[in-house]
């Protein structure tokens, strides 16, 4: 043995293609959300953009659950663009009114998504937070650092932030299941020492959160740190896990949250997906046209279990 493998056991509740899923949190929530979407799950991926600290994540969930509007005090103008301290930088408009309109639409959409979701996947990135006028912000939007104070959350603060939103979640969706993971992305900007402290706080907090019956923990952080445990599984920046690592973590996630029929369905779709990605030298040839027709038959058979309408319509255009 030259490594220590982390084994995952099937969760009490399992994800199916009939379930609606919402992911929120750090950029690893995007990674997991995109993997789910690629495999034909119904998923809304980080509707508020990437948010790294748990207080801001749970605040956004609270606002979505209660359909509470964002405060205008959080709006800031920087370099001619209006943004909100609770949201990712991608939400920016030329006027305050345009931003308010966009935020209102975002709130309404996410409130409905949360109400319909069977699963909420939350990825916590860091316990390091920035405060402005006593309020923790999700994003500083390149505003002068002099306007913020920086500190590290305590375990109690993280747990309290979830407790504050928990009742609201159940009021809007009594059957929701929550998967929490600590992001394996390293926050080296705050130094590796602080990153280690930050991840430890998040990990202890999540361990206590799993006392709530709706919360389960998926060990993506441990898989990266203690199972893969090698720089060849990182991107060139030595901060983000690479595609090989994502594949491996996804495999572990599948073992924990998908049953065997769901995994087999994913394998069938992946085979068809590779067929669709095939680029022939001679698209009009009899051989390729036969290949397309066979692929179409297989897709139509699978369409009773997965939503393949878009792919079927695109494939029809290629068949002569």
PLM segments and residue spans:
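A solvent-exposed, charged loop/short amphipathic helix patch at secondary-structure junctions
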Residues: 132-155
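A structural motif corresponding to the C-terminal end of an alpha-helix
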Residues: 113, 158-178, 205-216, 256
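Conserved SGNH/GDSL esterase-like catalytic core that processes O-acyl groups on lipids
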Residues: 31, 42-122, 126-131
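Active-site segments of SGNH/GDSL-like serine hydrolases
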Residues: 125-127, 167-196, 221, 227, ...
């Amino acid at each position: 043995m030259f490594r220590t493998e982390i084994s995952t056991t099937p969760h009490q509740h399992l994800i199916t293609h009939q379930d609606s899923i919402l992911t929120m949190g750090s950029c690893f929530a995007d990674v997991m959300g995109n993997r789910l979407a690629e495999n034909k799950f119904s998923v809304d991926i980080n509707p508020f953009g990437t948010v790294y600290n748990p207080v801001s994540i749970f605040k956004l969930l609270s606002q979505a659950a209660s359909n509470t509007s964002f405060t205008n005090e959080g709006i800031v103008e920087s370099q001619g663009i209006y943004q909100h301290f609770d949201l990712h930088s991608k939400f920016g408009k030329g006027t305050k009114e345009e931003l308010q309109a966009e935020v209102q639409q975002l709130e309404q959409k996410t409130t409905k998504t949360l109400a319909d979701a069977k699963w909420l996947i939350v990825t916590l990135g860091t316990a390091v937070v920035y405060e402005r006028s006593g309020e923790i912000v999700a994003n500083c939007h390149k505003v002068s650092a002099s306007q913020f104070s920086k500190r590290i959350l305590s375990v109690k603060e993280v747990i309290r932030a979830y407790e504050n939103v928990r009742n609201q979640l159940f009021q809007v969706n009594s059957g929701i299941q929550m998967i929490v993971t600590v992001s394996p992305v390293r926050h080296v900007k705050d130094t590796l020492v602080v990153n280690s402290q930050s991840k430890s706080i998040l990990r202890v907090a999540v361990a206590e959160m799993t006392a709530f019956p709706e919360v389960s923990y998926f060990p993506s952080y441990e898989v990266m740190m203690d199972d893969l445990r090698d720089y060849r599984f990182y991107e060139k920046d030595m901060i983000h896990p690479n595609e090989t690592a994502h594949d491996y973590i996804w495999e572990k996630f599948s073992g924990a949250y998908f049953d065997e029929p769901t995994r087999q369905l994913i394998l069938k779709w992946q085979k068809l997906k590779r067929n669709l990605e095939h680029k022939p030298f001679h698209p009009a040839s009899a051989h390729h046209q036969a290949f397309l027709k066979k692929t179409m038959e297989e897709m139509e058979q699978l369409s009773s279990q997965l939503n393949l309408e878009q792919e079927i319509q695109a494939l029809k255009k290629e068949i002569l």
